[in-house]
Amino acid sequence: MDSPPETDQRDTGYTLHDDYIDDPYLWLEETDGDVSAWTAAQNDYADDYLGSLDIRESLRPRFEDLARTTTYMPVKARQNGYFQRVRDADADHPVLTFRPGLNEDRRVLVDPNEMSDDGSVSVDWYVPNPDGSLVAYGVAEGGDEQYDVRVLETESGETVEELIDVGRTGPWCFGWTDDGFYYLTTGSVGDGGQLEKEVRFHEIGTDPADDWTLADEFSTQTWPLVETDAESDYVILGHTEGWERTDLYYAELGSDELHSLVVGEDALFEPTLDGNDVYVNTSLDASNYRVVSVSLDAVDSNTSSTDVGGSSTDPNTPFETVVAERDDAIAQELDVIGDRIVVKYLRDAVHELVVFDADGEQDETVPLPGRGSVASFGGEDDLFFTYESFTEPPSIRRYAFGADETTVVDQPDISTETDLTVTQEWFASADGTEVPAFVVRRSNLECDGDNPAVLYGYGGFENSLTPFFGEFFLPFLESGGVLAVANLRGGGEFGESWHHAGRREHKQRVFDDFFAAAEHLVENGYTSTERLACFGGSNGGLLVGASITQRPDLFAAAVCKVPLLDMLRFHTSLLGETWTTEYGSPDDPEAYEYIREYSPYHNVEERAYPAVLFTTGERDSRVDPFHARKMAARMQAAQSGADPILLKTRSQTGHGSGKPVSKVVEEKLDEWSFLGDQLDAF
């Protein structure tokens, strides 16, 4: 098939704030037979094109080797031993395991590979109870992030509880007690009920139909969080509105009477319970965050405790500052282990782990292997965490407090075939703001302006891009490619103020930062516009969409994954309404003006565009696949150049989680054969 399938342009549109929006592809928002047939034709066109590339099969052996490596997920320590998910080299999904000691053999508790013949069923998360005797886990199908929750007994491996069709839930809203657990349940995707939320309590051994409700009054923009602790008499309930603010409440265990802890502050509060003490990482009066604490036993339950002060001597201040804000680093997370407070900091987009005593005095800094990223840290006596960098695959590490170094518990057997160099480089954006990017390349690569390069970014929701090990980038880097990862405004790399500088009416700054990064790569001899591609997914897909519509001259190719693109209708389906705190609402006249200005779908015009590969998942329950469908159709009709506009919709996949390795390999072969062909790489 030499040209894309014809797409029916219908006489449809809608009125928004007295403006008529012509939308001939509005019908592609449906899920009927016409759309299914159109999607199948687009898949055939994309498959024909990608399948014709010789490079695709030449890359396959290396990609299979990279994918078929035993991988290790974080360790969760409990009183009776260690839980961990591990994926064997020949498996599609990781299995959930347990071992009493780190030197003992793992025993498989749950194997999702046996739950379906095609790898469509996955176990995406799990939470052991404090003594490790029980473990709850979430089971989803086709990557849709809609869960059944099952509970098994660790010793016997037997399932003792099963809650069906719980909805969009996870460990962030799950809390064990001695006799049961708090959990979030939502409506289903099919009936548009994902934004209908309820926090319930389930007592082990009882009928789930008898579960009682702790809270059910949540706005569409608000998501709850739950925090419990084995030594606490209380449960903490958080109401987080977008990425904007958090209200905190608490209740005695077993009671549905909630009391206000922090309500009405325009700041984020992330609580950790330690007995009846609450430690909170907060942005209130601290763009770089600080740690405060309070004893729930000392809080007057008849009043709303909204004063979060900075003085530990003020008797009228319920919260005391334990760890003050730093001006050179962002406090991102905390955990309490024994009498120590461990804080993960982000400084210049690289992580640090710092240990404080109970009074907030710094005891030590955990020695990390290099400039990289830390995730999933915690423990009972020792500290466990995951570490990775651009040149080191994720390893599970253990740190005994006071030691000189960390020890490796588990590490995959992946190594690069060449020496790589990583630099962090700064450049000026359109308004003069200095923005950094990591640049990864072969150490002996000549910067002669003629190397293929891929620029990756995100720039939103206070999400920070820190060093990561991308195994499928390795063949590209080894063959002389350049990878650049830009830390754009809208992210969290430099605190709440950096996030606010790139959201709502300031969203264009994110795109300008990305364009400046592209120009920096060209001006410094890393690449040329003829060999530069942009790459991003989800909110990063919006970034890619804005890049190819605003600056098609900068890029030769683009990969745009599970994207948001029709920004006048993003809020009408799935989780879109939740994101109005980040983008603004098109229903608001003021927000409508600046959103329409950059909305990629509404900025497509007849001209020559770079080659684009759009990808989406048919079971995506976050970003509606209609964004990719409508954008691909409009760009195919508008393309006056010779480069292809492709759309690949993947079956039995969602936004990204729960994807079997076999599908990951095919997806990566599509992306990198496309990029390799367009950039003359490999």
Task: Give a label for each model feature.
Residues 34-127, 138, 222-240, 244-252, ...:
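Non-catalytic accessory segments flanking enzyme active sites
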Residues 80, 131-133, 178-179, 231-233, ...:
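Short coil/turn segments that connect the beta-strands within blades of beta-propeller domains
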Residues 98-99, 150-153, 197-206, 249-253, ...:
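Beta-propeller blade signature
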Residues 106-125, 136-139, 143-190, 197-200, ...:
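Asp-box/WD-like beta-propeller blade repeats and closely related beta-sheet repeat scaffolds
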Residues 112, 155-166, 206-218, 254-261, ...:
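Blade-edge beta-strand/turn elements of extracellular beta-propeller
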Residues 113-126, 143, 401-404, 409-533, ...:
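Cap/lid segment of the alpha/beta-hydrolase catalytic domain
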Residues 197-240:
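Polar, glycine-rich mid-to-C-terminal structural blocks
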Residues 488-682:
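Active-site-proximal cap/loop segments of hydrolase catalytic domains
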